[in-house]
Amino acid sequence: MSDTRAFLLFHVSAYPKAELSDLFKALYQSAFGCEHLVADASAAEAYIASEAAHARPHAGEIVEPLDGPYVRVHLDILKKGLSAQTLARLFALSAEHRAQTEFEKKLAVLTGMVRQGELPFDASECERAVSAWRAAGFPPCHHSETFRQAYAPAYRLMKAEYAPLLPLLCELDGRLAQGRRTTLAIDGPCGSGKTTLAALLAQLYDCPVFHADDFFLRPEQRTPERFAQPGGNLDRERLREEVLLPLHEGKPVCYRRFDCHSLTLQP
């Protein structure tokens, strides 16, 4: 649950030269996410790479939370190994959504704080600016020139749920940039997000996903001795022969899935 008041106080503290339009932009991004849909991912990737090459180093945290389900990721993240391609794809996957009611609530908090003197802006000016913006249908707004000169913002938005994955993605991109073949095993308890993470990686890297469910033990393998072994509930021999060895040798992978209903291997 967001705390708009705390967010705005933190924002003006982190960016003391921010103007009213910069707070408008932060709240807009908090509610609506990416301002534009990405029609051409390759063009977005090239633009990110070019912008990052000329960007001023960012003094604060690379990942900056907003007041909602989005974060700003500053382009310094590319110096930590993340590729422009991966960042562009994360940006594209974080498509704009319309949370109009939540946005209006955030604006009401902003205007109330200005009225109470909690934010360093003129109350009448704030009311007029909000009214004019609302009458125009709340189009995307830009950072003020003062903000640009002071902070040289260079970032992209992404869903906040992707932010904890950035260290992993930086590591993967670093390996791939070196031309290293990479096989990633994802482990965790039931409901921990393994399938969700695997699906995201498949979207980001156009890579195959091999599910452990396809390698459950066949009935004849289910013995007390087998279940007493670490990882004994997995047909690791078949996983090794049909998937891991071909991957290691750079060969095509063709494997049989285990059917949990018939308890047999599919052809």
Task: For the regions a language model picked out, list residue spans one by one.
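P-loop (Walker A) phosphate-binding loop of NTP-binding proteins
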Residues: 189
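Active-site signature of alpha/beta-hydrolase-fold catalytic machinery across serine-
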Residues: 200, 204
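Short hydrophobic/aromatic beta-strand immediately N-terminal to the Walker A/P-loop
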Residues: 183-185
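Conserved lysine of the Walker
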Residues: 194
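Long, basic/Gly/Ser/Thr-rich N-terminal segments
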Residues: 1-147
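Conserved nucleotide-sensing/catalytic segment adjacent to the nucleotide-binding pocket
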Residues: 208-211, 216-266
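N-terminal pre-Walker A segment at the start of P-loop NTPase domains
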Residues: 151-176
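Hydrophobic positions on the alpha1 helix immediately C-terminal to the Walker A/P-loop
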Residues: 197
